[in-house]
Amino acid sequence: MNKNDSRLRRARQTRLKIAELSVARLAVHRTNLHIYAQVFSEDGTKVLASASTAEAEVRKELNGNGGNTAAATLVGKRIAEKAKAAGIEAVAFDRSGFRYHGRVKALADAAREAGLKF
């Protein structure tokens, strides 16, 4: 079992536990160049809000560098604003098997500061 398989196994277990809660899910995906955040509906079938460093407005603001904690903070603020605009106040945080550290933590903290509850 390699590093990615272990991460996917952890992510699967987390998603099963979140599904039992029947609450909207804030999922985070991290790559070397970008960070992505999506808010899924309670049943997990619809994306209610999304934000990433690949968006044109975000790239312009970051001058093309989307792989750092400053970029993750900006994405966290944007996802919280979009989720609140869609009527979502509380979510369950799905870190997709990534460690709660660095960019993932920066995104979560920024989303909390912007008013999203989890």
Curated annotation (Swiss-Prot):
GO terms for biological process: translation. GO terms for cellular component: cytosolic large ribosomal subunit. The keyword Calcium does not apply. InterPro entries: Ribosomal_uL18_bac-type, Ribosomal_uL18_bac/euk. Keywords: Ribonucleoprotein, Ribosomal protein, RNA-binding, rRNA-binding. The keyword Transmembrane does not apply. GO terms for molecular function: 5S rRNA binding; structural constituent of ribosome. It holds the Pfam family Ribosomal_L18p. Gene3D superfamilies: 3.30.420.100. This is one of the proteins that bind and probably mediate the attachment of the 5S RNA into the large ribosomal subunit, where it forms part of the central protuberance. Part of the 50S ribosomal subunit; part of the 5S rRNA/L5/L18/L25 subcomplex. Contacts the 5S and 23S rRNAs. HAMAP family: Ribosomal_uL18_B (MF_01337_B). NCBIfam families: L18_bact (TIGR00060). Belongs to the universal ribosomal protein uL18 family. This is Large ribosomal subunit protein uL18. It comes from Ralstonia pickettii (strain 12J). The lineage of its organism: Bacteria, Pseudomonadati, Pseudomonadota, Betaproteobacteria, Burkholderiales. The gene is rplR.
